[in-house]
Design a protein with these regions (language model features):
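Conserved core of the PLP fold type I
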Residues: 15-156, 166-167, 173-181, 255
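Conserved glycine-rich beta-strand-loop-beta hairpin in the small C-terminal domain of fold type I
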Residues: 253-263, 274-288
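Active-site C-terminal subdomain of aminotransferase-like
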Residues: 213-231
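Structural signature of PLP-dependent enzymes
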Residues: 217-220, 241-263
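Walker B catalytic acidic pair
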Residues: 162-163
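Catalytic cores of nucleotide-enabled group-transfer and carboxylate-activating enzymes in metabolic
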Residues: 60, 176-177, 217, 235, ...
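Conserved N-terminal helix/loop that builds the PLP phosphate-binding region
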Residues: 1-22
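Active-site PLP attachment segment
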Residues: 179-216
Length: 288
């Protein structure tokens, strides 16, 4: 994240405005799923930018992916998860720490290999279709269809879509989220502001299928949103007033230039110093 480009002045002004409103909500514990206005603003953003409609009651605000996975783990009983291989080491540690069974599922140039999900009797598949970490692969349209078909074959199967790095695609039209083609409500959607704004924001969110929302409300009525009310109201204003979209557009241009600069240096070094051509894996997207 480029800290110099963070909209510090805007955040400072919004913070002052929120305090000046003398809102009593700041003194009390908010809704367990997060501030309603923030959830509604995220729903509007998802419709405009990621291509799918969701209701605010399906959205849960939290302070990190690990918290969201704790919720997901509690929704299911002894299911086998499928993790992309390779993936971020944090996820394997997260699953091991919580004693959750998982299988490492191979990747090819189109994304996760669906046949392996069947082979290992996986019921919950965790995928990063917008920009896989660490390979940089964007899941193909045909593989997305195949993955959704796999989920639709069994009522107990679900897909966890981590829309990691989706804001930063530098060439061509943005690809809609996997959730946008999920007509049977089989995708659990994860989003975060840590990459798009700053890791210090520590606000992430989860969109639950309606069938799982009922289970969540029954099993986790005690699980209170860990994000301070003040932070949620500041982020709501940042989104509502149009600053978030402007920030994303600005950062997309900046990161594209940085990526092009880095790629040119690598190619120049490889041809002049190493005397060989190199292949750069991954799409023109994301921060890695």
């Amino acid at each position: 994240v480029d800290s110099k480009s963070l909209a510090k002045t805007i955040f400072k002004r919004i913070t002052k405005d929120v305090y000046d409103e003398e809102n009593d909500d700041l003194l009390f514990q908010g809704h367990i799923q997060g501030d309603l206005l923030l959830r509604k603003s995220i729903c509007e953003y998802l419709l405009q930018s990621r291509g799918f409609k969701v209701e605010a009651e399906q959205l849960i605000i939290s302070s990190g992916t690990e918290y969201l996975f704790y919720i997901i783990f509690k929704l299911f009983n002894n299911e086998i998860y499928g993790l992309e291989n390779p993936c971020h080491k944090m996820f394997k540690e997260l699953f091991l720490t919580n004693n959750v069974s998982f299988k490492a599922i191979s990747l090819d140039e189109a994304g996760v290999v669906v046949e392996e999900l069947k082979k290992y009797n996986v019921n919950i598949a965790y995928v990063t279709p917008s920009h896989q970490f660490p390979t940089g692969t964007i899941m193909s349209i045909s593989r997305r269809t195949e993955l959704l078909n796999w989920a639709n074959e069994n009522p107990d199967r679900y897909i966890v879509e981590d829309d990691y790095d989706s804001e930063f695609k530098y060439t061509g039209r943005p690809i809609p989220a996997l959730k946008a083609t999920d007509i049977n409500d089989k995708v659990i959607y994860l989003g975060s502001f840590s990459k798009s704004i700053s890791p210090a924001i520590r606000v992430s969110y989860l969109v639950l299928p309606k069938a799982l929302l009922n289970i969540y409300q029954r099993k986790l009525p005690y699980f209170i949103c860990p994000v301070p009310t003040l932070n949620q109201k500041i982020l709501y204003r940042f989104i509502k007033d149009g600053h978030f979209v402007k920030h994303i557009n600005k950062m997309r241009t900046l990161y594209k230039k940085k990526r092009e600069f880095l790629v040119n240096i690598i190619k120049t070094y490889s041809s002049k110093i190493l005397d060989k051509e190199i292949y750069i894996q991954g799409a023109d997207a994301g921060l890695h």
